[in-house]
Amino acid sequence: MRYQKLEIQEANWQWKYLLKKHREGENITKHTEQSLIELKVQFLTTLQHSPAEIEQWIKAEMTAEQRKRMRQSIRAKRKRFFNAEKLTTKKKSIDLDYASWLRLSKYSKTHAMTLSETINHLIDERENQHLYSEQMAKMKASLKDLLK
C-alpha cells in the first residue's frame, strides 16, 4: 500500500463523506423507507469519535455498491492528502484566460501531452530559442571582429 491508512482519520473521512452525501439528498443506507433512513443517519451522527462503530455501521447499513463508491472516494482523498504533504507532489493551480487555456489544450492534444508537460515543453523551447539566439549573436560579433 502506497499511502498509509490511519484508522481514526479514515473513520472521520468516512463519517464526513456519509453525512455530506445525506445532506445532498442521497440515500446512504440500504433502506428505502424514509423514517428508517432518518433513524439510521441520526444514529450515525452520534458516532463521530468512534471509528470501530462507524465501520460496523457501514457494514450493517450500506449496500456493497455504496461501500465501493465510498472506498473509492476515500482512497482519492487519502492520495490527495498525502500528496499535499510534499511540495513536489502538491497540486498547484493557475488562473488562465479561456482563450489561453483553449490554445494550450489544443496544443497538448496534438502533441499527446498533459497540460503540465505542454507548459514545460513550451518553456524549454523558449529557453532553447533564447540560448540559440545568444549564440548566433556571439558568432556574428566574432565574425565581424575577424573580418575587420
From Swiss-Prot:
GO biological process, one term: cell division
Family: Belongs to the MatP family.
Lineage, top ranks: Bacteria, Pseudomonadati, Pseudomonadota, Gammaproteobacteria, Pasteurellales
Description of how the protein assembles with itself and partners: Homodimer.
GO molecular function terms attached to this record: sequence-specific DNA binding
Keywords from the named record: Cell cycle, Cell division, Cytoplasm, DNA-binding
Gene name of the encoded protein: matP
Described purpose of this protein according to its UniProt entry: Required for spatial organization of the terminus region of the chromosome (Ter macrodomain) during the cell cycle. Prevents early segregation of duplicated Ter macrodomains during cell division. Binds specifically to matS, which is a 13 bp signature motif repeated within the Ter macrodomain.
Species annotation: Haemophilus ducreyi (strain 35000HP / ATCC 700724)
Subcellular location(s) per record: Cytoplasm
GO cellular component, as recorded: cytoplasm
Protein name: Macrodomain Ter protein
Annotated InterPro entries: Arc_rbn_hlx_hlx, MatP, MatP_C, MatP_N, MatP_N_sf
